[in-house]
Amino acid sequence: HKQQHQTYADDRRQIGIHQPPTHYTIICFPHTSIPIGLKDSEISKKMLIFVEILSLKTAAMGNSVKRVLFVNSEIFPYLPESEISNIGRYLPQGIQERKKEIRSFMPRYGCINERKNQLHEVIRLSGMNIIINDVDRPLVIKVASISAARMQVYFIDNEDYFHRKQVYLDENGEFFKDNGERAIFFARGVLETVKKLRWAPDVIHCQGWISHVLPLYLKKAYKDDPIFSNSKIVLSVYDDTPAADFPEDFKDKILF
């Protein structure tokens, strides 16, 4: 198991991802963890336990769960296998197997092979621009399918932010200086795409640091939007963030 875990760690370092996260915490929900190396059926069983908890907790807030939006930093097999990418892969499947509607999003990092994974652009969802720091950048939406799970994954893409081969760290292991802008673009790209889909989620599950700007936008900029008016937020926190700070002007760039 240690040798297998080291292989995953090496794979992740090669494409500029921090060490494999080892802790997983759901804010306001019980602690859970999925060890690497479980068979698909075993992982799905553990996912279903979490789904039960999620459904009960949300029902206690006065809402039944029908639609769950997943905003992921990583999903296997598009990035190397790890705890966080396994959860991005199998948790939506577990929810879907309970007859719930799901939508999954992640960034379209440059290391993802579009031909191998059969990504294609969704023209009707692409075309808008997102302004960050007075600069317009086009939002491109791509989609691929995980056939074994009968599940679609939406990818947020932009040439400036997501076409580099490394994920979060440069070739010297340094945090990209524009990672804050990338997180902003990703969060707003997801929310604007969900609005275009006219798909109102009951629960929005954010996992991985690059998704953590999204709850702030929901509480502030999108708080009066009817698509998100009844959405509950679940935030998963990992130790996947390098010891780096966003630039001082991040707080200005996040405004729009």
Functional labels for PLM-detected ranges:
Residues I17, L56, S64-K66:
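Short, positively charged low-complexity motifs
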Residues T25, D40-E42, K46-K57:
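Short, positively charged and aromatic/hydrophobic N-terminal segments
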Residues Q3, T7-Y8, P35, K46, ...:
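N-terminal hydrophobic alpha-helix used for membrane targeting or insertion
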Residues H1-Q19:
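Intrinsically disordered, low-complexity, charge-rich segments with an acidic bias
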Residues I49, M61-F256:
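Catalytic cores of nucleotide-sugar-dependent glycosyltransferases that transfer UDP/GDP/TDP-activated
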